[in-house]
Amino acid sequence: FLTELDRFDIVIDVRSPAEFALDHIPGAVNYPVLNNEERAQIGTLYKQVSPFAAKKLGAALVSRNIANHLESHLLDFPREWRPLIYCWRGGERSGAFTHILNRIGWKAMQLEGGYQGFRRTVIDGLERSANQFSFQVICGMTGSGKTRVLQEIGALGAQILDLEGLAVH
């Protein structure tokens, strides 16, 4: 799947900045259709008033935010530009953004299943390929030289994962 991302000129995550900050597809840019406060407001309205009221306000906010992106980030792209658009599940938010870009004339594509589907694909791929690797665990007391051993193994060209080093221990 990741190799297929090369078919696109850009990968656009339209989720809120908070969602994007938690995790996103590597290399994606964040052009949110709802900011953090707007997303919370829509969620509250959906649960406390009605889905209809939330969708009505959401459509107005999303439309306004897409217009802002068109007048700023997306101003200079040529007609041949090919963006891939995604949100959490590949539904309303990315659907609205993709629809507008396609109506303009760009060849926008919506990521089926959204970020949730992307994560599922990556996890499934890791689970399928895990048996192709040989994992060796090096353990020992603090100060016993585990990091030094891993560094030597890495210098020989082997792939290593130094969890203590990553944790700055």
Residue spans of the language-model regions?
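Long, charge-dense
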Residues: 110-123, 131
